[in-house]
């Protein structure tokens, strides 16, 4: 193992004598910027990647189909704690699906909402439905736990339809992801 130590020491000394700190920082910076174009660097799920998953968390007490229509179409419904837009359940879709003629955005924002029925917090993924003009019904602008714009994946004032071919916003769905963990 002594030979490995000597080899490592001579290699590091050689590099230190032949390069400057600025050149090393420049090389690392080029590598990071270059990799941003090749590798996904944003914490979002892309539609082509099949990032959506079903956690099985939509059991009977959480199923929006079992809640009455007035409750689901209200901004006070527990799943809508971070919605900024029109509820798809008022626009021809459901709490979890886009209306016909619109497509879900492949990127979304998330929120943690408290379910008063079981006292637990749940992670909710909000997807904008795009491709049709704004619905205009059931406008909600809730900002529970919203973060500043520089934490954009937790910020609900962004037009998330910008990832679609047709970036016209129509409405927003509230998809239950699972239990929030501390």
Curated annotation (Swiss-Prot):
Q: Which cystines does this chain contain?
A: 75-140, 81-113, 88-171, 90-138, 91-135, 98-129, 130-161
Location comes to: Periplasm
- Cofactor detail note: Uses a protein-derived tryptophan tryptophylquinone (TTQ) cofactor.
Which cofactor names does the annotation list?
tryptophan tryptophylquinone residue
Which terms does the record give in the GO molecular function aspect? aliphatic amine dehydrogenase activity; aralkylamine dehydrogenase (azurin) activity
Enzyme class name:
oxidoreductase
Sites where Tryptophylquinone occurs are at 109
Q: How is its activity regulated?
A: Irreversibly inhibited by phenylhydrazine, hydroxylamine, semicarbazide, hydrazine and aminoguanidine. Reversibly inhibited by isonicotinic acid hydrazide (isoniazid) and isonicotinic acid 2-isopropyl hydrazide (iproniazid).
A GO CC term assigned to this protein in UniProt: periplasmic space
List, alphabetically, the InterPro entries matched.
Amine_DH_Ltc (IPR016008), MADH/AADH_L_sf (IPR036560), MADH/AADH_Ltc_C_dom (IPR013504), TAT_signal (IPR006311)
Known EC number? 1.4.9.2
Annotated substrate binding lies at: 84, 156-158
- The site feature described as Transition state stabilizer is recorded at 172
Q: What does this protein do?
A: Oxidizes primary aromatic amines and, more slowly, some long-chain aliphatic amines, but not methylamine or ethylamine. Uses azurin as an electron acceptor to transfer electrons from the reduced tryptophylquinone cofactor.
Q: Subunit structure, briefly?
A: Heterotetramer of two light and two heavy chains. Binds two azurin molecules per heterotetramer.
This protein's name:
Aralkylamine dehydrogenase light chain
Q: Which organism is it from?
A: Alcaligenes faecalis
Q: Which gene encodes it?
A: aauA
